[in-house]
Amino acid sequence: MNLEGIINISGKTGLFKIISKNKNNIIIESLSDGKRSALNSNNNANLLEEIGIYTYDDTKPLSEIFNNIAKKENSNKSINHKSSNQQLVDYFRKIVENYDEERVYTSDIKKVIQWYNILQENGLIKKQKK
């Protein structure tokens, strides 16, 4: 799964795609509503391709987590990120069996599931080839 150019921004909901960059700012487009705006250096943004989930062994890249969800859900939407905490934890255990429960919080699980569903809604989750 290619997450290149997809970011999340602290303080803003949803995911954004980088459209272009210059010296002073970055032009981004919301995956939710398609609105474009400028992102300046004061904003804290993270590339999804650089985010990982802690396991007891190492750190799994987000793309691997999304691939696991896509396999489980046949590339369809996953559970709602607003499900109960227990439902989210039970679901995530099926996706990443050995995730580090002391370092991965329920809020992290909610974000991962929300991001997966946003990517799926925007056609960025492809059917897995067998």
Can you annotate each of these PLM segments?
Residues 55-59, 78-85, 102-109:
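Conserved phosphate/pyrophosphate-binding and hydrolysis machinery centered on Walker-type P-loop NTPases
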Residues 87-130:
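C-terminal charged interaction modules
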Residues 71-97:
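Amphipathic protein-protein interaction modules
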Residues 1-80:
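The feature represents the first ordered module of a protein
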